[in-house]
Curated annotation (Swiss-Prot):
Family of this protein: Belongs to the Ycf3 family.
Gene3D superfamilies linked: Tetratricopeptide repeat domain
GO BP: photosynthesis
Keyword field contains Plastid: no
Protein name per UniProt: Photosystem I assembly protein Ycf3
Annotated organism of origin: Prochlorococcus marinus (strain MIT 9301)
Length: 173
């Protein structure tokens, strides 16, 4: 196990050195370079489990980043942290912001649906079947969009949609 970990650390370090070299020599504005560095540092902190530090780096990156796709990716990473921290409403709000920046992120839709589906299961456990159906319908709505964007990529969700009777035939056309 340690040899695999050493190899992984070597690969991570090599990638970081290469990425930093590319950023230094690329003819891009200083502002964009700083945005990337904040994003990269946020990703490293997130991977190390330091979520509060990661969020700070991501927020700094967003202040500088102008590219919508990159902004969407940063917001998606922030939403993942909020979701991990149990801040579901903030997570949904942040995923929705990510989708405004880059509407072609099926993983954002998938994760919003996961929150809705969880809320539906909780309502069902509490005996509130009307509320369960509301949450499950919301999950189905966003999951259907995710499946359309990434056909075959979320087979478990496709199965849930079919088994729950919430699948629409046009989803597969």
């Amino acid at each position: 196990m340690p040899s695999n970990q050493n190899r992984d650390n070597f690969i991570d370090k090599a990638f970081t050195v290469i990425a930093e070299s590319i950023v230094k020599i690329m003819p891009i504005a200083e502002k964009e370079k700083k945005a990337y560095i904040y994003y990269r540092d946020g990703l490293a902190a997130q991977n190390n489990g330091d979520y509060s530090e990661a969020l700070e780096y991501y927020k700094e990156s967003l202040l500088l980043e102008e590219n919508k796709i990159d902004r969407g990716e940063t917001l998606k990473n922030m939403a993942i942290i909020y979701m991990s921290n149990g801040e579901e409403d903030l997570s949904i709000e942040t995923y929705e912001k990510a989708l405004v920046e880059n509407p072609k992120q099926p993983s954002c839709l998938k994760n919003i649906g996961l929150i809705y589906e969880k809320r539906g299961r909780n309502a069902e456990q509490n005996g509130d079947l009307d509320q369960r159906d509301i949450w499950f319908d919301k999950a189905a709505e966003v999951w259907s969009k995710a499946v359309r964007l990434y056909p075959g990529g979320y087979l478990d969700i496709e199965n849930w949609l079919k088994n729950s009777g919430r699948s629409s035939i046009d989803m597969y056309l």
